[in-house]
Amino acid sequence: MLPASEPRVVRAGNLVFASGQIASDDKGLAAETRIDPAFPYYGSAIKRQTRYILDKLTKAFANEGAGLEHCIKAHVFHTDLSNFHAFDEVWREYFPKTPPCRATVGMGATLVPGCLLQIDLTAAMPNIPVRVFTTSAPRAPVNYSEGIIVGDFIFASGLMASDYKTGVPIEARVDPAFPYYGSDIKRQTRYIMTNFKTVFEAAGSSLENVIKAHVYLKNLHDFNGYDEVWKEFFPSPPPRTTVGVPDLLVRDALVEIDLIAVTPKAKREFISVPDIPKPLAHYAPALRVKDLVFAAGALATDFRTGVAPEARINPAFPYYGSAIKNETRYILQNLVKTFKAAGTSLERTVKAQVFLTDISDHSGFEEVWREFFPVSPPITIAQTTGLLIKDNLIEIDLIAAMP
């Protein structure tokens, strides 16, 4: 099926979730975003695409009674981060006063050739009190909010190990004179988490109240060192999604971490799901807060043999079956169990982020997706450089509403 011409937008409680948007229509890359090949130096493709996407999202949020000015969180995926500065110039046009918190990373190809970025936005309903806060943590000289409180939810911008003066600061680097003493990924992770501690304390909360994490690693071989530090900060860890990315916005940065927390008064319920495979790493399968359930990114693994046997193609019959369909079905069946344990159901999903190692697997993924979702929730699909289980093709990250 071709990409939807209009964003899918769903309200859940006080929040409004939109599908990730690229600059495409039913004919491919939208004509009004193209640079005339006869005049290749006149105009900016990234600026045109950014405007096109934000105009579409403006209309979509208006249908739910919200506007871009009510957006509180953005995930932005660029196929080439050298486009970031021009993108941010347009971002300032659309968010002149209170920009949303933002996480920006490099990603692989989009679903439509020629599309340079994907924008994923979440908004708050206009009648809900929103408080923007600042912190003493280092901040980049670009257009985003450090933190926004919406009811009991605390949204923060993604953080890298940077002081935004020298790049990666000395305290987050291994001394080049002593290259075998210490770990860059551990130092960067610790630096980031220390700054997040400052961020959430400024909101009157703490790391203890984090309810969801997205982690973007440039090299997945760094995961184990990162996870060791993660355990120091999270004795009781939140749900987490971890994917590989080709690039980050700070030179030599190895990881970007993106967190959502809640206020101390909000009740958090960790969800135990005994009938799905127990993860090897340090995260919870799901967590319920108020009327939302946040699930960890799910992979097609039993955490014993790698790719789960029932998700594999029999090597003796390599042309019988589809690996991407098998993995997608395996993951969604486990997410059915996860949401059931939380007291809700898969059909109440209000937001999905899907990470594919090969964007050409999208068609097979979508066939199975539509078996489970005749009407798809808002969905963002991005190409990652890798996942944490060898030979896994897909990771699925879902948020569901309570009945």
Predicted regions and their residues:
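N-terminal presequence-like segments and the immediate start of the first folded domain
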Residues: 1-55, 59-73, 77-194, 198-212, ...
